[in-house]
Amino acid sequence: MYGKSPALVLPLLLSLQLTALCPTEAVEIYTSGALEAVNGTDVRLKCTFSSFAPVGDALTVTWNFRPRDGGREQFVFYYHMDPFRPMSGRFKDRVVWDGNPERYDVSILLWKLQFDDNGTYTCQVKNPPDVDGLVGTIRLSVVHTVPFSEIYFLAVAIGSACALMIIVVIVVVLFQHFRKKRWADRADKAEGTKSKEEEKLNQGNKVSVFVEDTD
């Protein structure tokens, strides 16, 4: 039994060695996962990838869409050396290429969002010989307004604090200005009173001298 096993094991070992030398790699896709955008605005559907194979002319990118309320999958965009926009359908004249394959970026830009754009967008990248891998997904929610987040509240708080500081500085500067002006007015008034008293005193002295001369 054991004497015959090497003939059976040898092909298996060779196949394992070949698999180890030439492993099957997969393209990894990265997306935001979930995204909210306001109705009527434009949104960037970001999709990046990593691949063990160098990016070349064989790279292909396929974007598809499945509505949230169900229905068949719809074509959104295709890229192979050049971008190919949809010639018909809901995304005609509403989607443009916004990626850079050399930087592993295959994002697209969707214009003039509508409420029926709610759904899941898929991003599939093939970079031969890396053709396997999971498809990236983005769940887009089109809303009337984007709810305030902590970042917005923080920005409002910082802006309010800066405005308050500016107001305080202005009040202090104005207070110092009017205070100096008031002291200057008081000094001028005191100087004027002193001058009048000196003038009266001089006139009194002149009268006294005149009376003495008359006598």
Swiss-Prot record:
Tissue expression profile of the protein: Widely expressed. Expressed in the cochlea, in Deiters' cells, possibly at contact sites with the basilar membrane. Expressed in both outer and inner auditory hair cells. In the stria vascularis, detected in the basal cell layer. Not detected in thymocytes, lymphocytes, macrophage or dendritic cells.
Annotated membrane topology: Single-pass type I membrane protein
Assigned keywords, A-Z: Cell adhesion, Disulfide bond, Glycoprotein, Immunoglobulin domain, Membrane, Signal, Transmembrane, Transmembrane helix
Signal peptide range in chain numbering: 1-26
Segments in the Extracellular topological domain: 27-154
Subcellular location: Membrane
SS bond partners: 47-123
Glycosylation sites: 39, 118
SUPFAM superfamilies: Immunoglobulin (SSF48726)
Transmembrane segments: 155-175
Annotated spans, Disordered: 187-215
Ranges of compositional bias, category Basic and acidic residues: 187-201
Gene deletion effect: Mutant mice display early-onset progressive sensorineural hearing impairment that is more pronounced in the high frequencies. They show an altered organization of outer hair cells and supporting cells and degeneration of the organ of Corti, accompanied by mild degeneration of spiral ganglion neurons, that is most pronounced at the cochlear base.
Topology, Cytoplasmic side: 176-215
Coarse class of the protein's main subcellular location: membrane
Protein family per UniProt: Belongs to the myelin P0 protein family.
Role according to the record: Mediates homophilic cell-cell adhesion.
Name assigned to this protein: Myelin protein zero-like protein 2
Origin species: Mus musculus
Gene it is expressed from: Mpzl2
